[in-house]
Regions:
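N-terminal glycine-rich phosphate-binding loop and ensuing alpha1 helix
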Residues: 6-70
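A structural signal for isolated positions on well-ordered beta-strands in alpha/beta enzyme cores
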Residues: 13, 56-59, 85, 122, ...
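Conserved beta-loop-beta/alpha segment of the NTase-like Rossmann-fold superfamily
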Residues: 91-164, 181, 186
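Hydrophobic packing residues within well-ordered alpha-helices of enzyme cores
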Residues: 25, 49, 70-74, 139, ...
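Conserved alpha/beta core of the MobA/IspD/sugar-nucleotide pyrophosphorylase nucleotidyltransferase superfamily
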Residues: 5-7, 177-256
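Conserved donor nucleotide-binding strand/loop of the catalytic core
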Residues: 79-91
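Short aromatic/basic micro-patch
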Residues: 35, 130, 171, 185, ...
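Short helix-capping segments at alpha-helix termini
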Residues: 52-54, 76-82
Length: 256
């Protein structure tokens, strides 16, 4: 496994996704821009990468209509100097990631330091504001070992598979089931080529980046310990839980 100093020689880039609208929040404001203890949700997510030495550049992928807001009210307002680009996303998550990957390749091709084939790519949901340095360190370490990993937690509840009529059809072994989070971290060349093939094939049924790597390569994706605090803001209840966690930590003035 490479030492942290070796990871820093390569250029590591994070794509932070902020193009979703979040209809389940029942608000006009997209969930990633809602206030969370004095700052927008997305500002917390970006702040975690800003403070993490293992990432050099951040690409923020936004809805086209929100780009100027993100630049002025998020990136500039909170001094997020690692955010090199704010770009428009696609109609689906995987298309937004592909736009981010193409932009990341342009950054790498502009003569930046680091080996041409080296470096790692983080993909993170902007609506996961409580990601912390420990998760980022663990996922980067496992990406160095295995070339592909995702933050994840073992499920707590029994999971049922339903039939088409809504009846329980199967009960998988809970010991084998994990709830997937972000970041998802990959060797840059691996994930770029996997996405390129996926787009070329016209595949559209994709729910996360690990699924693309699983489908298009023979590399196994490592499940890396995330955190139950690393929740995704999807419903009003999630926002209240995130506020509770931040208040307990008493660190929201520091911006992490």
């Amino acid at each position: 496994m490479p030492a942290m100093s070796e990871w820093k020689k390569a250029r590591n880039i994070a794509i932070v996704l902020s193009a979703g609208r979040g209809s389940r929040m029942h608000t006009q404001t997209p969930k990633q821009y809602l206030d969370l203890c004095g700052r927008p949700v997305i500002a917390w997510s970006l702040g975690a990468f800003e403070a993490f030495d293992g990432v050099d550049d951040v690409i923020l992928v936004s809805s086209p209509e929100d780009i100027e807001y993100c630049r002025s009210e998020i990136v500039e307002a909170y001094g997020l100097s690692k955010v090199r680009r704010v770009i428009p996303g696609g109609a689906e998550r995987y298309l937004s990631v592909w736009e981010g990957l193409k932009e990341a390749k342009r950054i790498r091709d502009q003569g930046q330091e680091g080996p041409a084939d080296g470096g790692y790519l983080f993909v993170h949901d902007g609506a996961r504001p409580l990601v912390d340095s420990a998760i980022l360190e663990r996922t980067l370490a496992d990406a160095g070992k295995y070339s592909a990993c995702v933050a994840a937690m073992p499920v707590k509840d029994t999971i049922k598979v339903s039939d088409e009529e809504g009846f329980a059809a199967q009960t998988p072994d809970r010991r084998l089931l994990w709830q997937i989070q972000t970041p998802q971290v990959f060797s840059f060349s691996l994930v770029y080529e996997a996405y390129r093939k996926l787009i070329e094939e016209g595949i559209t049924q994709v729910t996360d980046d690990a699924m693309v790597v699983e489908r298009e390569t023979e590399v196994r994706v490592k499940l890396t310990e995330g955190s139950w605090k690393n929740l995704k803001i999807t419903t009003p209840e999630d926002l209240e839980i995130a506020r509770l966690f931040l208040r307990q930590e008493n660190n929201y003035s520091a911006g992490r």
